[in-house]
Amino acid sequence: MNTVIADFTERAGTGRVLKAEPEAIQLAPEQTALIVVDMQNAYTSIGGYLDLAGFDVSKTKPVVENIQKAVTAAHAAGIQVIYFKNGWDNQYVEAGGAGSPNFHKSNALKTMRKQPELQGKLLAKGGWDFELIDELQPKSQDIVIEKPRYSGFFNTALDSMLRARGIRNLVFVGIATNVCVESTLRDGFFLEYFGVALDDACYQAGPVEMHRASMYNIKTFFGWVSDTQSFVNTFQHNQQLAKTA
């Protein structure tokens, strides 16, 4: 299998080969971030936004477990872990008014308009829906970024935080594959970041075909697709080498 090696990774001399599609890719831990997308109660829990909006969240447990494995491997290898939290102030000023397409397309906002008793509860900062799930709580060395739209690059400090740390590779896990994961990976591609999605550590909003379509888009046009075990194996190996050096 061919392996993609960016010139900056080759210069670093610390790259490890990650098995991926359509070809393997070499990643240096110090140039890589694990992006944990929106693992909030809103997107994983019964009674959260996605569930109340009519999306199936009953199969998210294996995804949560795979993300935990990826986070553990990232921490051990010295890979920067970044958590996203999607949402707005509790008055929804940040969500945009009727002049914003977000007002008309956000399923959270539409659900609250249909069910006024939910107003102020869905994706509102300070509320249960907005908070990260208990199984995925950040460590002191992790970064948490709140974002007001699907892409983590929009109206956040993500780009400057990455560039200041010399990070050029982004490995994505989280929810939803076809919305915030793909949106951020695409924007990263346009900003010259190398994006990898871990297939079995992402979950879609909607039918599983949406997940498959996003993975096809990513590996064909915008980046690479790997899996949790390959990521863990690659960077556990990296850690073992460091211990024996």
Curated annotation (Swiss-Prot):
Keywords: Hydrolase. It catalyses: (Z)-3-ureidoacrylate + H2O + H(+) = (Z)-3-aminoacrylate + NH4(+) + CO2; (Z)-3-ureidoacrylate + H2O = (Z)-3-aminoacrylate + carbamate + H(+); (Z)-2-methylureidoacrylate + H2O + H(+) = (Z)-2-methylaminoacrylate + NH4(+) + CO2. GO terms for biological process: nitrogen utilization; uracil catabolic process. Its EC number is 3.5.1.110. InterPro entries: Isochorismatase-like_dom, Isochorismatase-like_hydrls, Isochorismatase-like_sf, RutB. NCBIfam families: RutB (TIGR03614). Hydrolyzes ureidoacrylate to form aminoacrylate and carbamate. The carbamate hydrolyzes spontaneously, thereby releasing one of the nitrogen atoms of the pyrimidine ring as ammonia and one of its carbon atoms as CO2. This is Ureidoacrylate amidohydrolase RutB.
